[in-house]
Amino acid sequence: MNITATVLLAFGMSMDAFAASIGKGATLHKPKFSEALRTGLIFGAVETLTPLIGWGMGMLASRFVLEWNHWIAFVLLIFLGGRMIIEGIRGGDDEDEEPRRRHGFWLLVTTAIATSLDAMAVGVGLAFLQVNIIATALAIGCATLIMSTLGMMVGRFIGPILGKKAEILGGLVLIGIGVQILWTHFHG
């Protein structure tokens, strides 16, 4: 795989994380750049590891991974998105609210895993090609770091406009990503 194909693959793989990061950034009360970078680093690290894991699994048992990865991603994203929607509906008026709580480490990791299962599936496919898997995984991770950090900062500006509805929107984005993963699996 040449450098152009690797870069296109890397940024293509980062789009789910970018969309999820916009939702995350919108639900926080004015996230700082350090929080955006933290999110980018977590998403980027997970997106670096998942193609490597997928590549290893592809060498061992690609059929099982390809049969189940879309369902795992779908369930995780529906759960996380549903949780965000419920929290958004339960919330009070924005004026009466304390500053929104920060997203915990494990919630970010879970979201990163859910949005990176497609990268794991790509890793399975890469196991059957002549590709430098380390360089490709690093490219995917770096692209995801950049796009997730950018997504959080974009979300920062959307959040105050939407208020508490941002959490509902973020949940809908995650559910939409899950549905898109399932749709793509069944309809190519």
Swiss-Prot record:
Coarse class of the protein's main subcellular location: membrane
Keywords: Cell inner membrane, Cell membrane, Ion transport, Manganese, Membrane, Transmembrane, Transmembrane helix, Transport
Protein name per the record: Probable manganese efflux pump MntP
Gene: mntP
GO MF annotations, alphabetized: manganese ion transmembrane transporter activity
Pfam families (alphabetical): Mntp
Membrane topology: Multi-pass membrane protein
InterPro entries noted in UniProt: Mntp/YtaF, Put_MntP
Intrachain S-S bonds: none
CC annotations in GO: plasma membrane
Family: Belongs to the MntP (TC 9.B.29) family.
UniProt keyword DNA damage present: no
Subcellular location: Cell inner membrane
Listed NCBIfam families: PRK11469.1 (NF008546)
PANTHER family: MANGANESE EFFLUX PUMP MNTP-RELATED (PTHR35529:SF1)
Purpose: Probably functions as a manganese efflux pump.
Transmembrane regions: 3-23, 66-86, 106-128, 143-163, 168-188
tRNA-binding found in the keyword field: no
